[in-house]
Amino acid sequence: MSPHKISDNHRHLMLSRFMMGNGVSIINMPFSGGQPKDGAELAPEMVEKAGLVDDLEHLGYDVKLIQNPEFKSRPSKEGPNQALMKNPLYVSNVTRQVRDAVQRELEQQRVVVNIGGDHSLAIGTVEGVQAVYDDACVLWIDAHADINTPESSPSKNLHGCPLSFSLGYAEPLPEEFAWTKRVIEERRLAFIGLRDLDPMERAFLRERNIAAYTMHHVDKYGIGRVVEMAMEHINPGKRRPVHLSFDVDACDPIVAPATGTRVPGGLTFREAMYICEAVAESGTLVAVDVMEVNPLLGNEEEAKTTVDLARSIVRTSLGQTLL
């Protein structure tokens, strides 16, 4: 049996205290413009076809599926800051639509499941959540901090920059992103799984005293204690809504082989699931992102393994339990 296969005995609906009912909106985000490798835009359809809607209906949710095929369409020409960052107008156009879609579904009291796509999409998901829940905290699960500014980014790929927009570090804003704004403070952000940082990211994390738990901390304290520390830091007393943003490259390449920026020494499958279980048990989840699945960066079995991991992240975050 696949380690990600759902069992009929593992049903549990986990409602958020911030929602009125059992609605879940899956927003497919077929987009790979924030980085140079084709394939991430294929992930939402593959995750859907693998059975994500059935998974969540099986848990007892009222599921709404939102397709966004237009996200694959690039603008006819790029913006004025193409030399500063790659595909700025394309990323801006899509993430602005993402913001609006996330906000719209949350306003209807539905938990939002965002399936990417590359992690630049979080420029929109974070701002969309904050538009409805302006005290929401962000638990960022990733091998990378994604906190570079366009100026500090060595690669100029915007999937490494989303949090610099959310935190206001990208100011003065490039013309293409004039619509963005600082929406979170450092005290409402925590990282788990970090193991590959650029110099400026390391400086930001240290100087701004951001809660950043690397794989060293996971090894030293265990995932249970790390999650406890992270959640207590960003959400003391469980009073705030939680936005879980999960880049599958946080997991070890054995667990998530089909992704674009693999780094050895990542989370095990069980460690990843424990994070999701803890968020579900808190009763505070309002949105979950699953990003950077790239089916083209592996053989058929590796693509399936990574797609099934994405499904497991969503199911477990929304309450699937063993007992």
UniProtKB/Swiss-Prot annotation:
Q: Has the keyword Transcription regulation been applied to this entry? A: no
Q: How is the cofactor bound?
A: Binds 2 manganese ions per subunit.
A biological process term (GO) from this entry: arginine catabolic process to proline via ornithine
* Cofactor(s) needed: Mn(2+)
Top-level lineage group: Eukaryota
Q: Which UniProt keywords apply?
A: Arginine metabolism, Hydrolase, Manganese, Metal-binding, Urea cycle
Q: Which PROSITE patterns match?
A: ARGINASE_1, ARGINASE_2
SUPFAM superfamilies linked to this entry: Arginase/deacetylase (SSF52768)
State the pathway, as annotated in the record: Nitrogen metabolism; urea cycle; L-ornithine and urea from L-arginine: step 1/1
GO MF assignments: arginase activity; manganese ion binding
* Any Gene Ontology CC annotation: nucleus
Q: Per UniProt, where does Mn(2+) 2 bind? A: D142, H144, D247, D249
Positions bound to Mn(2+) 1? H119, D142, D146, D247
> Which NCBIfam families would you find in this protein's record?
rocF_arginase
PANTHER family per the UniProt record, alphabetical: ARGINASE
User: What is its quaternary makeup?
Assistant: Homotrimer.
> What name goes with this protein?
Arginase
The species this protein belongs to is: Schizosaccharomyces pombe (strain 972 / ATCC 24843)
